[in-house]
Curated annotation (Swiss-Prot):
Listed PROSITE patterns: DEAD_ATP_HELICASE (PS00039), HELICASE_ATP_BIND_1 (PS51192), HELICASE_CTER (PS51194), Q_MOTIF (PS51195)
GO CC terms of this entry: cytosol
Protein name in UniProt: ATP-dependent RNA helicase DbpA
Catalyzed reactions: ATP + H2O = ADP + phosphate + H(+)
Motif (Q motif): 4-32
């Protein structure tokens, strides 16, 4: 952890204020390395573990560098998954809260028309998955003429998921005069080639862990036949009694099967895989993040980009077939300086996958023998007690910064020739209110939304009921959340 403070980076007071509200005390190692170079607008290739504060390392400079006055997108962030796109958009919104930075997330299986409408509004930063971003570019609904900054996040995962061709197609459409940042946990040849082809003399930054995986994770291997996996899973979880655990399966069918069996055994659990509708996936991840349940059964869709710091255990119910996936899965634990455990089940026919993984991570995973019946019985009472305990809901790390914000609805927008500056000018004249109390402003054709910060919402709402904007008296009320 760096001894530096974020105020050492010559950031605007609005960004520093947001970081303070988010509880960012000191830059992590990756933030300390990346932010100063990014603020100089130099291209960057960053090799860094997940869970290292990476999103803020590009989110902070992006929010600092974009110009609020410009209405068209100035930055594009590409992510491999929808979950990560939403997560990054939320993080950027919170970092840029007091600078009134407007971020939009675009991804598949979400209505295109709604995204098109959002992109017509003032938007500073667009975060999205490659397929949907390319759709918007091809249909002319994502303006690129003012784009100055590109971030490719989780580049190795883009490669694994077959998105590199789409990423290249997107880059070919972007202005050549731009700054590009590429982030990856690993740097396979195709990712290196991407940086050589599309980047301008990039600065390379590598945040070294002890080997490929962090030394905060304790790795263990259990040999088991397929039919006895479920029994072993129940024994291991009884002994370990984890606070928060992800159980990874190779297929959606296996996820469904394991989830049903654990649910039947009264485990506080849920599941996530690519076959579920998007809203359900988001809801499951949000509940898991808040601690509403302790066991998440998942395919690799959940292995990247989910910002949850306190996962104590990862169990590979099915050993991953790709060595990189082992790093990505186990990287869900041992984050943000916490320790964690990574437990892997292996059947007699899967040794070749294990050999590849061990060669890749640079050490042999210690083998263990499954718990005895006596050991399981000894821990059963404590396990059962925790199983039936009321969940402790975790505090949302964004709660403090979002406290005291009221979103106001006005029944007028572009068609009444109303602009963001009109709201700022009018509201800032209210006694006891300044421009710093005004957050993100969204102006649509017939309606507008204005965030009022610092607990000043009720005052502004009361005054604006009898105050005109550009000579027009608009209806105003608190927006429905």
């Amino acid at each position: 952890m760096s001894k530096k403070s974020f105020s050492d980076y010559k950031l605007s007071k609005e960004i520093v204020r947001a970081l303070t509200g988010l509880g960012y005390d000191h830059p992590t190692e990756v933030q300390g390395e990346v932010i100063p170079v990014a603020l100089q607008k130099k291209d960057l290739v960053v090799k860094s573990q997940t869970g290292s504060g990476k999103t803020a390392s590009f989110g902070i400079p992006l929010c600092e560098m974009v110009e609020w006055e410009e209405n068209k997108p100035q930055a594009l962030v590409l992510t491999p998954t929808r979950e990560l796109a939403v997560q990054v958009k939320e993080d950027i919104t919170n970092i840029g809260r007091f600078k009134r930075i407007k971020a939009a997330a675009v991804y598949g299986k979400s209505p295109f028309a709604r995204q098109k409408l959002e992109l017509k509004q003032k938007t500073h930063i667009v975060v999205g998955t490659p397929g949907r971003v390319l759709d918007h570019i091809e249909k002319g609904t994502l303006s690129l003429e003012c784009l100055k900054y590109l971030v490719i996040d989780e580049a190795d995962e883009m490669l694994n998921m077959g998105f590199i061709d789409q990423v290249e197609a997107i880059i070919d459409e972007l202005p050549t005069k731009r700054m590009t940042m590429l982030f990856s946990a690993t740097l396979p040849e195709d990712v290196e080639k991407l940086s050589r082809t599309y980047m301008n003399s990039p600065t390379h930054i590598e945040i070294k862990a002890a080997g490929i995986t962090t030394d905060k994770i304790e790795h263990t291997l259990f040999e088991v036949i397929e039919d006895e996996k479920l029994s072993l899973l129940k024994d291991v979880t009884t002994i370990e009694n984890p606070d928060s655990c992800i159980i990874f399966c190779r297929t959606q069918e296996n996820v469904d099967h394991v989830y049903r069996q654990l649910k039947r055994a009264n485990y506080p659990c849920d599941k996530i895989h690519g076959g579920m509708v998007q809203e359900d996936r988001f809801e499951v991840m949000d509940d898991f993040r808040k601690g509403k349940f302790r066991y998440l059964v998942a395919t690799d869709v959940a292995a990247r980009g989910i910002d949850i710091d306190n996962i104590t255990h990862v169990i590979n119910y099915d050993i991953p077939l790709e060595k990189e996936s082992y790093v990505h899965r186990t990287g869900r634990t041992g984050r943000a300086g916490n320790s964690g455990k990574a437990i892997t089940f292996i059947t007699p026919y899967e040794n070749r996958f294990l050999e590849e993984i061990e060669e890749y991570i640079g050490f042999e995973i210690p083998k263990a023998i499954g718990p005895s019946k006596e050991e399981v019985m000894k821990e059963k009472a404590a396990f059962e007690e925790k199983l039936h305990a009321k969940p402790i809901i975790k505090k949302d790390k964004n709660a403090d910064i979002n406290k005291g914000i009221m979103k106001l609805y006005f029944n007028g927008g572009k068609k009444k020739k109303i602009r963001a500056v009109d709201f700022v000018g009018t509201i800032a004249k209210i006694k006891g209110v300044t421009a710093e109390d005004i957050g993100i402003i969204t102006i649509q054709d017939n309606v507008s939304y204005v965030e009022i910060l610092n607990g000043k919402g009720p005052l502004v709402l009361k005054v604006m009921k009898t105050t005109t904007i550009k000579g027009k008296q608009l209806k105003v009320h608190e927006a429905i959340k």
